[in-house]
Amino acid sequence: MTSRFGQLTYTSFDAVGTVGGWQVKETSDALTPEETQLMLAGVRTVFRTVEPMPDYPTPEQLEAAPRRLAYSRVGETYAALWHTVPAGADSTGRPGNVFAHVLLDRTPDVAPRHRAIQWWRSPHWLCPYGATAVSRAALAEPGAEPGRVVTKDSVVAFALDTTTWRLATLFGLLDAVAAALDGGPPVVLGVESPDNAAQWIGLLSFLMSPGTAAQLSFSTFDRADQLNPHSGQMLSAVPLEDLSAVPAGMVAISEAETLSLGELGGEPHRTAGGYAIDVTPWSAMAQVVVLDPGSARRLLDDIDAVAEQVRDSGLHPAWPMAMAVAGRAEFADAEEEAHEVIAAHSPPGVAVGSAAARTISGVLSAAVGTTTADAWRAVQELPTGPGAVFADTTYLCRAVTDDEWLSENSPIPLGPRMFHGKPIPPPLRTAIGRALDPGRGPQRLLQVADLLVRAGVEDPRIRTTLVEDVVPRLGDAEVRERVGADARLTLGAVLLNDGDANGTAIDDGLLDWLADTAPLPPPDELAQATPWDRTWTIAALRGVRARRRGTGGAGQDAGALLWWLRATGSADFEQTATASAWNPEDLLLAIGADPLPGAAAVRTLVAAADSPALNRLAAKVIDENGDTLAVACAAVRTIEPTVWLQQRYVETHQHAYVPLWDEVLSVVDPADVHPDFSTRLLAFALLGLFTGHPYPRACSGFAASDRLGGEAIERLMPLVGEGQLAPHAVVAIGLLRAAAPPDPAHPDVTLDELAGHLAEQVATGMAGDDNDVDGVVAVMAQLSGDSAEPALRGYRKMVTKLLARRGDSPSLTARLRGGRQA
């Protein structure tokens, strides 16, 4: 069987058959490699005393020499103590050797439990000095009991030494250590000697429970340059002369300088070096109870007795003291602070009937008083903890049965802590039974239900009461008039929050009354709502009504219909979203952060006007890349012609998108296509035509519209002005397309004519000299592949005529085609 303790020594020595130098000298109790590494991680091989050791110290000098005891939890379940002493010169004559003796506690949370500092100057620590003594030092079984230097008696005598005033330092140290235990900055204590450090650490440790003291990592001797704020060591003692060199991020306190005491709820303590330390009830109680040796000594025993009555794990450092103070007349001046700590930090699972349970019960009962107002005051004032939970329960128990409280407050107030997902405390379950008495009337029952639902209480009796005792009475208009908006929404939430997405338990008249409680929230508010809060419930009621009326009758609640289908996970959502064009805000609201299913956004992308919401929808479609039809349409809505050309999408994407655009336009009624989409797609078609890439044939219908064609040309003219579309090439292509005989396989006459219009506008901006004529003719010859003289003469004639008659009506294209339909 593995023993509780394991030991290891580490030093610089030279043994027969080994290489000299720093190494593990000896281990005991079957240490595993993992345990050995944990122990070695805390070993210090440098020990710089303030005063150098004599070359040949006497036994008395060795006994009085500084030593370092460090403690920490290690690994997941272990604790370790590192005892380090100067060891003189090693076997090579090198001075400055150190001897480290490490003790590993494998079960530190098992009785008997001692404060780690009680092992200070324990006789089992090996303290060899000199190479010979180091070589002979051998481990023995650790004693069952710790040392006798740091005890309850010693720390009380130390704190209340009449020759040295230490209490102010103690009070500041208590609060600084409490903060460190709670994740605050580590504390550095400047001391005259390591022995003083041990008594300070002992005093702190005995003023908290053994389990909490086991979480306080410390060292009795370090130098300032060895400190690290992030090492995990909460309390470090250094020589007084090192205090000025303590690194930033640590709270430095000197035992030799006066600490200015603060006040609980007011000014903080301040050290001589200017460090501010927030005052806590722990030090406030200590200022009352640690004044007399007799009472202080009894207090330490009481702290341990309290800790034995509960599971001593994770206790707040001040809680055992508070429990010891509560109810004792001699400590009456600390009772308020004690009650505050007990209410905030009492642990769960205290044995029923124990003295601790009776004390806690008495404190909590006093905190909530006797009335609903008293309990409400406690809810507001008590910090989060068991006391607050008790106050919350007591308040709700009283509020739901207090007609006067329910009548005077609207809405009934609630504290910051709710009961969502928690079991109903037995006292509250009993109070709910009384509060839901049908004889109280529908208005009062609705108030009670509203309060309970808002508090997060889940009790089937609430819905039963509403369905059986409230809903039948709501046909009376006078009864409805007395029901406030909050109660109406609570009723709606309870009736719907039963897996009935269609609200079958609510008739049409009641549903209209509930849905009209408030307007549909704007999308930004609904996006932040949580299920069954006020905003969410309003939308749910309107969504249920819209679903009942159908898409055609939803009216202004069409968005609520779509949102409700999505919120309830309806299988109809994708079909409904895909079948119609929606306000982009409504579609975005319905889908939230989830991916858009299938082609749900296609009709909206084609039929909606340009808007910021549509831009967000299109960007979401492109980012998710979940449906090719939707992505192709989203590209039309978000990408400008300039970007389409600059990024070469006309080369890389347009070939793939053209059949998708044609497919969409073949199933969407032309009357449903928004002009903003038509114009953008027509501009892409012209880009394809002028760059020799495919374009959607369905655009011919858009090109027949003077307005759409003109807007598409306006989108492309900046590309010509910037030189991204060469003017000579635009004119050349426009003339060639206008003069070409009709192709029965591709009757894109209107698109060709639109290209001719663009060519005419470009020509209007030309100088019209021989350079322009020659440039356009050269491009025409290159594109047609015919550079014979007759062809060149014909091209020159066409260009010259265009430049000569710029701005004439009808256009050259119309004359070449014999006219066109407007």
Curated annotation (Swiss-Prot):
Entries under Pfam families matching the protein: GAP1-M, GAP1-N2
InterPro entries (alphabetical): GAP1-M, GAP1-N2
Disruption phenotype: Loss of DNA conjugation when disrupted in recipient strain, no effect when disrupted in donor strain. The recipient strain secretes reduced amounts of EsxB. Disruption of the probable saeA-saeB-saeC operon completely blocks polar localization of EccCb1.
Note: DNA conjugation in M.smegmatis is unidirectional with distinct donor and recipient strains; mc(2)155 is a donor strain while MKD8 is a recipient strain. Mutations in a donor strain that alter DNA transfer do not always alter DNA transfer in a recipient strain.
Described function: May be involved in assembly of the ESX-1 / type VII specialized secretion system (T7SS), which exports several proteins including EsxA and EsxB. Involved in DNA conjugation in recipient (MDK8) but not donor (mc(2)155) strain.
Protein name per the record: Putative ESX-1 scaffolding and assembly protein SaeB
Organism field: Mycolicibacterium smegmatis (strain ATCC 700084 / mc(2)155) (Mycobacterium smegmatis)
Lineage, uppermost ranks: Bacteria, Bacillati, Actinomycetota, Actinomycetes, Mycobacteriales
